[in-house]
A protein has these predicted regions:
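Conserved SAM-binding loop of SAM-dependent methyltransferases across substrates and taxa
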Residues: 1-10
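Class I S-adenosylmethionine-dependent transferase superfamily signal
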Residues: 4, 80-84, 111
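Class I S-adenosyl-L-methionine
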Residues: 100-141
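Short strand-turn motif at the edge of the Rossmann-like AdoMet-binding core
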Residues: 19-20, 58-59, 95-100, 123-125
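Glycine/threonine-rich flexible loop motifs
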Residues: 62-73
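Short glycine-dipeptide loop
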Residues: 10-11, 87-93
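A short glycine-rich, Lys/Arg-flanked "PGG" loop and its adjoining helix->strand segment in the class I
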Residues: 72-90
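S-adenosyl-L-methionine
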Residues: 10-13, 17-63
């Protein structure tokens, strides 16, 4: 949230949601503590009409069973993508974390239908053996 605030500047809005409390408040950001599945679109938007960018760093509590973890990650990603599809302004962008697995290509194709540009991104900071990657979409239509 702090990074996003630096990008949007004093005239932008940053809204975050997490199940865990923030260690300390972040001035200029609006934080909702809760589960994304139990949070309404209206609660996320607040006074805003739409978002220009939706970022999702959600990851499931891992079990160590790769197929289970990948399926849970895909479900969280699809929830975030669904929110983006409902809440993004035209030409908006979405970036979400997902574990690589059998659902990845289907989800990438879904994004390609709604965004003019879709990329797979593995951050340099991510361990080489990590299965987490990010899907980024620009130009929401």
């Amino acid at each position: 949230m702090q990074y996003a605030l630096g990008v949007v500047g004093p005239h932008g809005a940053v809204v975050g949601i997490d199940r865990d409390p923030l260690p300390q408040p972040i001035p200029g950001a609006r934080f909702l503590r809760g589960d994304i599945y139990a949070t309404t679109d209206a609660e996320l938007l607040g006074e805003l009409k739409a978002f220009d960018v939706v970022l999702s760093d959600m990851a499931p509590d891992t079990t160590g069973v790769r197929a289970t973890d990948q399926a849970r990650s895909a479900a969280l990603f699809e929830e975030a993508l669904g929110r983006a599809e409902r809440l993004l302004a035209p030409t908006g962008s979405f970036v979400g974390k997902i574990f690589q697995g059998p659902d990845l290509e289907k989800i990438r194709k879904r994004m390609a239908e709604r965004f003019s540009e879709v990329k797979l991104v593995k951050p340099d900071s991510s361990r080489a053996q990590s299965i987490e990657i990010f899907l980024a979409g620009k130009g929401f239509q």
